[in-house]
Regions:
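Active-site-proximal cap/loop segments of hydrolase catalytic domains
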Residues: 1-168
Length: 168
């Protein structure tokens, strides 16, 4: 889980001093999208920004057979405690949520539920919906968005003007 990831990254930072432990971002898709959101909600002291694509943000609404493998049966408090919807009010780090309009693996409603909870909690975040896309990290457009997001929030820089870039 995330505590193990944090311990590993800190150990790597000790071995490789060029790693900046004050600017750690995280991204993921599907279960990784869920976990990257969880990272900034529950471990904001370590993770400074998250790009989360197509995550199932509440395991009570996903494929229950899949979740029972990891969280057990019956559906109990462990499902609620791990819900990004329930924990949305904790957000205090930059978060970009990305979802494919036609995702047939993780229902886009899962992302919209966390969006609704963030709005109700008056939290600032970014949302990118990719029209016509399925279960995706964001395709080419999402790659630009992810790059720009981390340049802004981890480097404090200004992303390039993508439309002005020419290739030889």
């Amino acid at each position: 889980g995330l505590p193990d990831h944090i311990a590993w990254i800190k150990a790597a930072g000790e071995k490789y001093p060029y790693m900046d432990m004050d600017r750690v971002g995280i991204y993921g898709c599907s279960a990784g999208g869920q976990e990257s959101t969880t990272a900034v909600l529950l471990h904001p002291e370590f993770y400074k920004a998250a790009y989360s694509a197509c995550g199932c943000h509440d395991n009570r609404m996903d494929k229950i057979w899949w979740n029972e493998l990891w969280l057990g049966y019956p559906v109990g408090d462990q499902y609620k405690e791990g819900s990004n919807v329930e924990n949305a009010h904790l957000l205090n780090r930059p978060l970009m949520l990305v979802v494919g309009e036609l995702d047939d693996n993780v229902d886009p409603t899962s992302t919209m539920q966390v969006v609704n909870a963030l709005i109700k909690a008056n939290k600032d975040f970014e949302l990118v919906v990719i029209p016509g896309a399925h279960h995706t990290m964001g395709e080419d457009f999402g790659e630009h968005k992810r790059y720009d997001f981390f340049v802004r929030h981890l480097q404090g820089g200004i992303p390039p003007e993508w439309n002005a870039i020419t290739y030889r």
